Amino acid sequence: MSRATILHVDLDAFFAAVEQRDRPELRGKPIAVGGGSASDRGVVSAASYEARRYGVHSAMPLRTAARLCPELVFVRVDGRKYGRVSKQVMAILRRYTPAVEQISIDEAFLDVHGSEILHGTPTEIARSIKAVIVGELELTASVGVATTKLVAKVASDLDKPDGLVVVPPGEEAAFLAPLPISRLWGVGQKTAAVLAEFGVRTIGDLAALPDDLLARRFGKMGPVLALRAQGIDTSPVSGAEPARSVSHEHTFDIDTADAEVLERTLLALSEGVAGRLRHGGVKAHTIAVKVRDSSFHTVTRQRTLPEPTDQTEDVFAAACDLARPCLLYTSPSPRDQREHLVCRLL
């Protein structure tokens, strides 16, 4: 039986928490990172937990957020600052293991197999990581500990903020079974709506569906969903091996065709990629952008640069040029509402 050595570390309300840390007057107040005022175009990039109590959440139009919470304080996105703090967090994680797979600016997987002699059990490592992040960066993180990346990620989201959830080996399916189907990694609103037609409300309901039914309805994704519902995930933490590529990915919870929002997201992704290149002392010669819609249709475009680079500006310029046709293809229309958009920069 596999041991629970996979950790998923997720910073709590990252952008908003950084702003509240750096600006004491914002602490304890509902804030939305994403624009200077309610009149700005665009959406909320991050909401503090005080704002979430009013129903404000990421990807919500700024005007809507202001209506829900009249006392909401708006703060402009500072991608460079968040990128710097992200690098500090990842440096802390690498003190415990070289097997760190950063999957976004504010979250990463770790495989702590082999780290126990120096740092203790996986649960002790998780507690230590949380304490160090609070002590050194004045930020909180939620951590899930499990045998697989899939289950660890679900676990980290169950007790936010500042949570720690451990799923013992052999209990993955039982842990997932009572959770709403929306908790399962990769299931969005559109997929959940289709599953609801078959009476699926929980992850356990999905696990009970016949494999052939899932294959007929979802094609090649059917077997994948069946395995995920049982907590089965064989993907390794990629940081355990020398990386041949550096990537960042962002999933939009709500459809958007707002050019400002898309450009801002690409800038944050570009800063994350360039920062990791500089941290690793390497440069990229090829830039690729991958966009996947809710039907699992993927569009990928790439470009070889004249000279290798580790600069945010170069990565961002190439990413914008590459992304425009992809985003035009996947932009939502009244006849084709997308469940979500995934944009990945490599």
Q: How should each PLM-predicted stretch be described?
A:
Residues 1-227, 235-237, 275:
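Gly/Gly-Pro- and Ser/Thr-rich, intrinsically disordered tail segments characteristic of DNA damage-repair
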